[in-house]
Design a protein with these regions (language model features):
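Nucleotide-activated sugar donor-binding and catalytic core shared by glycosyltransferases
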Residues: 1-348
Length: 348
């Protein structure tokens, strides 16, 4: 297995030829990455000209992966997209391009299989590695080690440095407003890794708000600990969904990205649990270019009404139902192996 990727692929046993970018782009900000994407595609193509490839597995990021997949198909390589490109949210006109550069699409969201099949793209729903990952048995015990408080609020500012820079000030302002209304409030901020924790500390400086505790890792225990999460839009919202914890979702963007997203996105909901539910079960501000007021007000509306909190929990549990019984790693591996053997990758 040869990869362009990061350390987790290397840990899994892949030979990493070149490390891909750690910091992604969303919306119109991706335009700045066009040159890097082209260089990336050319480097992969040069490598493939000297090596025989059985199956190419592009993961997510259609802007980066479509050019590579197109070159692979020209070389006669079978292509299996792992993580369906979200053409249902934006860019349905790119379906013809997808049909030309894939043999099958493995979907992480339940509705995607039918959506793609209805448009003549071979697809299968395989579950989601976040939702179908079992919680460790000691998760609740670890959560009990965190500070007591009422309410307990979790801040999740993102897994990329660009997300943290944009969203951290907004989340801190929202937290400050909530602290002024709840004297016993305690908060955790979870940084995805040590580098991002250092970034958070540098942004906050010496004035860490009273009642805010900064940690890295141990996301599951932090979610189990909290009453409510303020989280950046993205996969982390599924980590919160997996434990059915009420949340408010936000994604701070520039004015250009905000108005561009309004033009390009075709779905009313952008936060993953709302997309999965097909309705607004979580307050979301995605994309958002305003201040913290609507964010903390949405959080306060939930915290002030236990019936709303219970309804949010029940709705999130409902979102999890289609995932029961799936093993995304096993199902993806079997589809890729079938494709490598020249068989139908979507057969049972």
């Amino acid at each position: 297995m040869i990869a362009w990727g990061g350390p987790k692929l290397a840990e899994a046993g892949a030979t990493v030829i070149e490390r891909s970018a750690d910091d992604g782009a969303m919306g119109l900000s991706a335009i700045s990455r066009i040159g890097a994407v082209r260089r990336h595609a050319a480097a992969i193509d040069r490598w493939c000209s000297q090596h025989r490839v059985a199956v190419h597995v592009p993961v997510d990021s259609p802007a980066a992966n479509f050019p590579v997949a197109k070159r692979m198909k020209r070389r006669g390589v079978r292509v299996c997209h792992l993580v369906a490109p979200q053409l249902w949210a934006w860019g349905p006109w790119r379906l013809n391009k997808l049909r030309r550069c894939t043999d099958c699409v493995l979907c992480l969201l339940p509705f995607e299989e039918k959506w793609f099949r209805d448009r003549q793209v071979p697809a299968r729903f395989i579950g989601h590695p976040v939702i179908n990952r079992p919680l460790a048995e000691d998760t609740v015990a670890r959560a009990a080690e965190y500070p007591a408080g009422s309410p307990k609020v979790l801040l999740l500012p993102g897994s990329r440095s660009s997300e943290v820079r944009r969203n951290l000030p907004l989340l801190l302002r929202a937290l400050s407003e909530m602290q002024s209304r709840h004297r016993r409030l305690n908060a955790l901020l979870v940084a995805a890794n040590a580098e991002l924790l250092q970034l958070v500390r540098s942004r906050i400086g010496d004035s860490v708000p009273s009642g805010l505790h900064l940690i890295t890792g141990d996301l599951d225990a932090a979610i189990a600990w909290c009453d409510l999460a303020l989280c950046v839009s993205g996969t982390v919202s599924l980590d919160v969904t997996r434990q059915a914890k009420p949340m408010v979702g936000v994604y701070k963007v520039s004015p250009l990205s905000y108005f561009g997203s309004r033009l390009l996105l075709t779905t009313p909901n952008r936060l993953l649990p709302n997309i999965l539910a097909g309705r607004r079960i979580v307050p979301e501000f995605v994309p958002h270019m305003g201040g913290a007021e609507p964010v903390w007000q949405a959080a306060e509306t939930l915290l002030a009404d236990q019936a709303r909190m219970r309804a949010a929990t029940d709705a999130l549990r409902g979102v999890l139902e289609p995932y029961r019984g799936h093993d995304p790693a096993e199902e993806a591996a079997q589809a890729i192996l079938r494709l490598a053997r020249g068989e139908n990758p979507l057969s049972s």
